[in-house]
Curated annotation (Swiss-Prot):
Compositional bias per record (Pro residues), positions renumbered to this chain: 543-553, 584-595
Region (Interaction with RALBP1): 651-795
Record carries keyword Nucleotide-binding: no
Region (Disordered): 112-238, 380-433, 469-720
Protein name: RalBP1-associated Eps domain-containing protein 1
Phosphotyrosine PTM positions: 288
Domain EF-hand, chain residue ranges per copy: 318-353
Modification type Phosphothreonine: residues: 173, 543
Function as written in the Swiss-Prot or TrEMBL entry: May coordinate the cellular actions of activated EGF receptors and Ral-GTPases.
Keywords, in A-Z order: Calcium, Coated pit, Coiled coil, Membrane, Metal-binding, Phosphoprotein, Repeat
Record domain EH: where: 10-113, 285-374
PROSITE patterns recorded: EF_HAND_1, EF_HAND_2, EH
Assembly and binders: Homodimer (Potential). Interacts with RALBP1, CRK and GRB2. Binding to RALBP1 does not affect its Ral-binding activity. Forms a complex with the SH3 domains of CRK and GRB2 which may link it to an EGF-responsive tyrosine kinase. Interacts with RAB11FIP2. Interacts with AMPH, ITSN1 (via SH3 domains) and SGIP1; may be involved in clathrin-mediated endocytosis.
């Protein structure tokens, strides 16, 4: 042990004393535990004790190991023998007597009584008694409680120096553990020895004459005035009773700093103290808590938000984890704020923890809101609370003024801005906000509906969807084809049509057909649902309809007129505009064209087609959609080759797809019907007028028939009707072989162009839909991030 030589007697004596001081059997004795009592019992001045602690190395380490403890005892013996206090003296001084520790007569009697009561440290009612030096054969390792804390004379203890805010009549039975904070090597209030009955050791500073008689009071026992007042004994029972009421001694109070020692102290308090419920709040404590509550929240019926509570309780300097646990216990309703009752419970727990009490796993019943018993002032009261006000501040600075107007002043202004605390202080409310942010957004406009197809699978804000809906309605007032309104069957039907028409990715991007992007103007068409979604309806507004089929001014928001303009020459648009000017009155023609056309985008069209055969009025308004091919023939003859070449270059892959679909028997039948119908149509207008020639239908009708390939199966009856009508028309109309060949070529060319145009538009629509989808997803993610960044904004 660093060259320390001990005799057998010293070895045994020091070993017994070390075991006596090492309550937790950790081989590390805290500096201000029983060791402090031992040194005080040696009746050495404060400066000598501090010097001994420095020399042995305990001050540097913060605890006494066995070697430091033995050296300290050796130095105590050196000091008591009057030799110079140096480390060298422990080996140079010969025949050094064992260190002497003075115990009063009362203490010895108490020790004797304790031996009869219990050998357990936890039950030592006379824990304030420290056994005499083991060398004299009186050493008891852990007899009763080892603490030297003795009750003070009631006269002294009734000093009127109570804290400004702290009640003066704190529970008389609160153990001295509440005043553990004052026991520092500094010696506390050594200048105020309380002479009274009971075995007290002389203070560090001066060995008093009465100390030999047992009247010397351990100065540390009377720490800062706040503790004296806080634990005022104005109405306490006699000193004899006090002996049994103060089980926790210096040892408990100091070792309480560790978790294990805290558990021991609590056990001692539970078993040896006379108070009933340590968690009950007395009237005095309640009043103090209420006053503190008012400093934060003047309205007693109000509540203190988590942020304010955090700022207040952080001043207690308790670890963040403990404060978090206290918050979880006290925030009974988990609303992120503290009511008055919850605040009192939290304050009580903080005070208790500051005084060495373990925090309970669950909130004690006496602290639960609406169950707090505040009328037990006559009861022995709850220790945690009393000393918490004055004692807790004294822990760090023992010299703090006794007056404690508020915890804000007494507790060091140390706001531990820890995220851990922040999470605990506002966890309950923030967690709800984060998990339910969607519901917070939704109420923005409950009347609006999510209209855009993409958001159907997502959850965009309704405000954004409302804007989109307004745009849609501006273009399609009567359009019942919004994604939300389309029936699943319609969607599947449209998907079929799209696949048959070879719209690769355009129509099914969002899980619904691209019919949305091909709406002809339902406003003008009225109830003609069949032509509502004509295949080439992508032409947005009447400004620039697709060349072959001039659109009637649908003003569709999703159409891409600019692209169409680029694709087709301006002359085409001009001709079509002219064609639109005079709608050809060809009732029979719309019937065949409508049959396939509606099928392209609406399953309802199948039914509508059948009825449309008889409802020519509906078809009439649609006529403007059909180009007047009597005029178009000339243009087709000249520009067919050019447009075909250009379209083939732009979309070479479309043509094979279209051709691939032609071989199907159903498509061929449809085309044959359309061609025959077109021929007859051309003949019919010849009789009437060249402008009304039904040549215009070919492009769209043919496309419709192609699209309706899937629907042709369910519309077999309709098909037969159309064939019958065509046959009748053919028989009634004289054939014009001269124009038939020309018409065929023109019609086929226009069909190809329309197909290509439709494919281009479908692909463009698909791309635009995908872009919109991506933008919406990005918007949603940004909204989510925004919500996550402001969960605590309400506090």
């Amino acid at each position: 042990m660093e060259g320390l030589t001990l005799s057998d007697a010293e070895q045994k004596y020091y070993s017994d004393l070390f075991s006596y001081c090492d309550i937790e059997s950790t081989k590390k004795v805290v500096v201000n535990g029983r060791v402090l009592e031992l040194f005080r019992a040696a009746q050495l001045p404060n400066d000598v004790v501090l010097q001994i602690m420095e020399l042995c190395g305990a001050t540097r380490l913060g605890y006494f190991g066995r070697s430091q403890f033995y050296i300290a005892l050796k130095l105590v013996a050196v000091a008591q023998s009057g030799f110079p206090l140096r480390v060298e003296s422990i080996n140079t001084v010969k025949d050094l007597p064992l260190p002497r520790f003075v115990a009063s007569k009362n203490e010895q009697e108490s020790r004797l009584a304790a031996s009869y009561s219990s050998d357990s440290e936890n039950q030592g009612s006379y824990s304030g008694v420290i056994p005499p030096p083991p060398g004299r054969g009186q050493v008891k390792k852990g007899p009763g409680s080892h603490d030297a804390v003795q009750p003070r004379p009631s006269a002294e203890q009734q000093e009127p120096v109570s804290p400004v805010v702290s009640p003066q009549q704190s529970p008389p039975t609160s153990p001295h553990t509440w005043r553990k904070h004052s026991r520092h090597p500094s010696g506390g209030n050594s200048e105020r020895p309380l002479t009274g009955p009971g075995p007290f050791w002389s203070p560090f500073g001066d060995a008093q004459a009465g100390s030999s008689a047992g009247d010397a009071v351990w100065s540390g026992q009377s720490p800062p005035p706040p503790q004296d007042n806080w634990v005022s004994f104005a109405d306490t029972p006699p000193t004899s009773a006090l002996l049994t009421m103060h089980p926790a001694s210096v040892q408990d109070q100091t070792t309480v700093r560790t978790v294990a020692s805290a558990a021991t102290a609590n056990e001692i308090r539970r078993q040896s103290s006379s108070y009933e419920d340590p968690w009950k709040i007395t009237d005095e404590q309640r009043q103090y808590y209420v006053n503190q509550f008012k400093t934060i929240q003047p309205d007693l019926n109000g509540f203190i938000p988590g942020s304010a509570a955090k700022e207040f309780f952080t001043k207690s300097k308790l670890p963040i984890l403990e404060l978090s646990h206290i918050w979880e216990l006290s925030d009974f309703d988990k609303d992120g704020a503290l009511t008055l009752d919850e605040f009192c419970a939290a304050f009580h727990l903080v005070v208790a923890r500051k005084n060495g009490y373990d925090l309970p796993e669950k909130l004690p019943e006496s602290l639960m809101p609406k169950l707090i018993d505040l009328e037990d002032s006559a009861d022995v009261g709850e220790q945690p609370g009393e000393v918490g006000y004055s004692g807790s501040p004294a822990e760090a600075p023992p010299s703090k003024s006794p007056s404690m107007p508020s915890l804000n002043q007494t507790w060091p202004e140390l706001n531990q801005s820890s995220e851990q605390w922040e999470t605990f202080s506002e966890r309950s409310s923030s967690s709800q906000t984060l998990t339910q942010f969607d519901s917070n957004i939704a109420p923005a406009d409950p009347d609006t509906a999510i209209v855009h197809p993409v958001p159907i699978r997502m959850t965009p804000s309704k405000i954004h969807m409302q804007e989109m809906e307004l745009k849609r309605t501006s273009s399609d007032h009567t359009n019942p084809t919004s994604p939300l309104l389309v029936k699943p069957s319609d969607l599947s039907e449209e998907n079929k049509i799209n696949s048959s028409v070879k719209f690769p990715s355009g129509n099914t991007v969002d899980g619904y057909s691209s019919s949305d992007s091909f709406p002809s103007d339902p406003e003008q068409i009225g109830s003609s649902v069949t032509r509502q979604r004509s295949h080439s309806g992508t032409s947005p507004d009447n400004t620039a309809p697709p060349p072959p089929p001039p659109r009637p001014q649908p003003s569709h928001s999703r159409s891409s007129s600019l692209d169409m303009n680029r694709t087709f020459a301006v002359t085409t648009g001009q001709q079509q505009a002219g064609v639109v000017a005079h709608p050809p009155a060809v009732p029979p023609r719309p019937q065949p064209s409508q049959a396939p056309g509606p099928s392209v985008h609406r399953p309802v069209d199948a039914d509508g087609l059948i009825t449309h055969t008889s409802t020519s009025p509906q078809q009439i308004p649609e006529q403007p959609n059909f180009a007047d091919f009597s005029q178009f023939e000339v243009f087709a003859a000249s520009n067919v080759s050019e447009e075909q070449d250009s379209e083939a270059e732009k979309h070479p892959e479309v043509l094979p797809a279209e051709k691939a679909s032609d071989p199907s028997s159903s498509l061929r039948a449809a085309q044959a019907d359309s061609k025959a119908e077109e021929k007859t149509a051309t003949n019919v207008p010849a009789n009437v007028s060249k402008g009304t020639t039904p040549l215009a239908p070919p492009p769209k009708p043919v496309r419709r028939r192609l699209k309706s390939e899937d629907e042709l199966r369910p519309d077999v009856d309709e098909h037969t009707q159309k064939t019958g009508v065509l046959a009748a028309v053919l028989t009634s109309q004289p054939s014009i072989p001269r124009s038939v060949g020309k018409d065929k070529k023109a019609i086929q060319a226009s069909i190809r162009r329309n197909k290509e145009t439709n494919t281009v538009l479908a692909r463009l629509n698909s791309e635009l839909q995908q872009q919109l989808k991506d933008v919406l997803e990005e918007r949603i993610s940004l909204e989510v991030q925004l919500e996550q960044l402001r969960p605590f904004s309400h506090l």
